[in-house]
Amino acid sequence: MLHVSMVGCGAIGRGVMELLKSDPEVVFDVVIVPEHTMDEARDAVTALAPGARVATHLDDQRPDLLVECAGHHALEEHIVPALERGIPCMVVSVGALSEPGMAERLEAAARRGGTQVQLLSGAIGAIDALAAARVGGLDEVIYTGRKPARAWAGTPAEQLFDLDALTEATVIFEGTARDAARLYPKNANVAATVSLAGLGLDRTSVKLLADPHAVENVHHVEARGAFGGFELTMRGKPLAANPKTSALTVFSVVRALGNRAHAVSI
């Protein structure tokens, strides 16, 4: 049985608890949220993980695993201290590692605690193949992200383009993964995950498109190297509770927790 504490009780966290509420091998003990959201979180936790308690931080708890589903800010506030205490962690908000020094702080904390932090694949597939290809040497990795035009509301694209007036797919960004993550932090998780599995933030090429005709999030990865080459296209349906998040992100957390809890892992 795997005893899990989770940071976050938003769309992703609730989706994870919903899918695992009938799995006896995964038990949620603590759900960590900001103080001003505790009442709302208690209602959700009571329905989805009635054995768990809601708290603002981990206290002296030592779960088997701490999983982050809360956003970039949670890494510094909760994940780094947990790693230093020797608690294994999983991270959904991989885009946070594009922030200067964050990847190094996570690694240093895990080393000090004698534990490990796992970066989850989230909304993208073939990360295992890309990471394996890196062993033999990669020459080029290109990530293209296409989303409905309104999915880019609240980003720099809204200042550069009239998103409601677009009539065709429009490139809103082209550059490195590091710059993409800096300019579009709420849309950076996939680009950052691809980068960290492959050539890194400064050598991974990224193109982002706003498409008025798109009804789903489309992720395309091209990779070439000593292994040969591959192309992957994924058409992800957005999470109903948060259209900026792919439903596959929730499924990837559930799979990762199942792999830790169950006798067979794949």
Swiss-Prot record:
Active site: 219
Keyword Secreted attributed: no
GO biological process, one term: NAD biosynthetic process
SUPFAM superfamilies: Glyceraldehyde-3-phosphate dehydrogenase-like, C-terminal domain, NAD(P)-binding Rossmann-fold domains
Keyword field: NAD, NADP, Oxidoreductase, Pyridine nucleotide biosynthesis
Pathway recorded for this protein: Cofactor biosynthesis; NAD(+) biosynthesis; iminoaspartate from L-aspartate (dehydrogenase route): step 1/1
Tree of life domain: Bacteria
Cleavable signal peptide: none
Reactions catalysed, as given in the entry: L-aspartate + NADP(+) + H2O = oxaloacetate + NH4(+) + NADPH + H(+); L-aspartate + NAD(+) + H2O = oxaloacetate + NH4(+) + NADH + H(+)
Assigned protein family: Belongs to the L-aspartate dehydrogenase family.
The protein's name in its UniProt record: L-aspartate dehydrogenase
Organism (species): Cupriavidus necator (strain ATCC 17699 / DSM 428 / KCTC 22496 / NCIMB 10442 / H16 / Stanier 337)
Gene that specifies this protein: nadX
